[in-house]
Amino acid sequence: MALDEKIYELRREKLKQIEALGQPAYPHKYEFTHTLPQVLSDYSDKTAEQLEAPRVNLRVAGRIMAIRLMGKAGFAHLQQSGQRLQIYVKKDAVGDKGFELYKLLDLGDHIGVSGYLFRTRTGELSVHVDEITFLSKDLLPLPEKWHGLTDVELRYRQRYLDLIMNPEVREVF
């Protein structure tokens, strides 16, 4: 069995586990309050104190482009329209089912999150997640982050991957 087939089967199994948690595999719609570019343009210049004064609650959606799990918490980067926003997921905030869902997510999956904005200790604008909604599973892996799509023929045949991975190509469209 080839590596891509193994990854495909592993992700299909994760999709079944997500459905077992009570999440639909491909929900029909997701209501969000802000797009990621809106959040970044409206709040990127705000300080931590300004974000806390009247707490900014929001619902956003995007594709997971980076994910890190550290015990009972984790970070991920969501991407939408070529812009990225960090999310912070804590087991105490999302509950056991929500954190189990987070542990089943992979790069390329689409999720929706609701929560409030804050700044991390390093000063990065982030969403402290209260609720995770699964939107769709990426069954095939995205190309490597650093090497990307180097094969020109593959870039033309799989144009959608080229648009996902290369911001300069997306700018042309």
Which residues fall in each region the model found?
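Class II aminoacyl-tRNA synthetase catalytic cores and aaRS-like
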Residues: 1-173
